[in-house]
Amino acid sequence: VGEDNAQMYYTLTYKNRPVIEESKLGVLIENQLFESALGVPNDTCHFWCENLKLTGTERRKADETWKPVYGERAEIRDCYNEMTLKFKKGEGDGAQEGGYDKRKNYFMNIIVRAYNEGVAFRYHFPETTNGLFLHIIGEQTSFTMPQGTMAYYERWAQGPYALRPLEGWGKEESERPLTLKLPDGLSVALLEAEMVDYARGKFRLSADKPSTLETSLYSSVDIISPYSTPWRVIMVGERPVDLIN
């Protein structure tokens, strides 16, 4: 979290080699119309995820297998360490998970899974006794890559690839998954998984921060808790072939 407690950040390294430099986390939510209809004072934060309070963490390990409907392998191992970061927004009545009395409080979790092959994270809004409406207009999720990273840019699905630096894209967006070639030789893939009732995301270059990819949603999304956004996945390999093995 930044010094002003207004922005969440993350970094990622692989064997002490930088993969993702300090990058933003967060969901952009506009609930003013909904809150006004309920007589609840509007949120005055510039970004919805400002001033979230960390209330607890949970950790667990998983090592299991599942069988795909089709594919090259009969079974796939799913082995990871998971941490859930629990946040609360707001004070006053109903300040407990599952309550949301008078809509003065919101709860959001960030679920992070660490695999040998990379990292996945998502935003989760817990179940409540009376449901909770959220109007998501975007994400702050970004990926700041080491200077000199090259991207296998693809403007649309099944389109031609072009190896391009992380600059000069203008307003163009790249499809996912997006494969990247880091200057130290590592190969990285950015992708999403388990997208249910959500807008597809692409990658665009930040206008303010060099070598930074931002998550660009096709449209806004209306959800009711409980709800989980798609996984944002970062795969890392010593060689390009490691990303598919």
What is the meaning of each model-derived region?
Residues 1-245:
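N-terminal accessory beta-strand-rich subdomains and adjacent acidic, glycine-rich linkers
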